[in-house]
Amino acid sequence: MLPAYLSNPFAAVFGGGKPIDGGRTYKDGRRILGDGKTYRGLFSGIFCGFLAGCIEIWLSMRGFEIMGIKMPTFGPNYASALIVVLALPSGALFGDMFKSFFKRRMGLKRGASLPLVDQLDFVVGAWFFTYLAAPEWFVSNFTTGIALTVLIMTPLLHLTTNIIGYFIGVKKEPW
């Protein structure tokens, strides 16, 4: 999940510039996504998440462990692993954009809180893209126990990192 977890903060750090929706509005008169979703943020977030995944692949191939826990393999071979580590951050950011689209439809402005949805949108997106790209790998690695752990720990990690982002000036809201 690290490539997915890292994509959003790096999108925020390196983002800015032209909004993906080009300032256009939907048929309800509201912005499609808003100014917070930019091409630079999307591509930098995917790139940084992918790079983190490549580092994990490299460490895994060398038998690296943290406190006795082996690094994930991400696939049976290098090409398969690269597909997974590209799907995770891509799905995370598209999940975040999907959520933004629906928040705009609900009349919620950029930065408005939508509890649990704000914390889990990128997980759902990452899982969806990864399942589409590598279904066998997904099913064998995201067991019920792992999935529950991710769903419980992610809101806590998300809140912690957003508070840090708020205090260092990267985020305008601490959620």
Curated annotation (Swiss-Prot):
Query: Which EC number(s) does the record attach to this protein?
Result: 2.7.7.67
**Does this entry carry the keyword Cell membrane?**
yes
**Obligatory cofactor(s):** Mg(2+)
Major localization class? membrane
Show the GO MF annotations. CDP-2,3-bis-(O-geranylgeranyl)-sn-glycerol synthase activity
Which InterPro entries does this entry report, sorted A to Z? CarS, CarS_archaea
Swiss-Prot/TrEMBL GO biological process terms: glycerophospholipid biosynthetic process
Transmembrane domains' residue ranges: 41-61, 78-98, 122-142, 150-170
This protein's superkingdom? Archaea
Instruction: Specify the enzyme's EC class, one word.
Output: transferase
Q: Which reaction equations make up its catalytic activity? A: 2,3-bis-O-(geranylgeranyl)-sn-glycerol 1-phosphate + CTP + H(+) = CDP-2,3-bis-O-(geranylgeranyl)-sn-glycerol + diphosphate
Task: Classify the protein's membrane topology as the record does.
Answer: Multi-pass membrane protein
| GO cellular component terms attached to this protein's record | plasma membrane
Listed PANTHER family = CDP-ARCHAEOL SYNTHASE (PTHR39650:SF1)
User: What family is this protein classified in?
Assistant: Belongs to the CDP-archaeol synthase family.
Entry function: Catalyzes the formation of CDP-2,3-bis-(O-geranylgeranyl)-sn-glycerol (CDP-archaeol) from 2,3-bis-(O-geranylgeranyl)-sn-glycerol 1-phosphate (DGGGP) and CTP. This reaction is the third ether-bond-formation step in the biosynthesis of archaeal membrane lipids.
Spell out the HAMAP family in the cross-references: CDP_archaeol_synth
Put simply, this protein is called: CDP-archaeol synthase
Per the UniProt record, the source organism is Methanosarcina acetivorans (strain ATCC 35395 / DSM 2834 / JCM 12185 / C2A)
UniProt gene name: carS
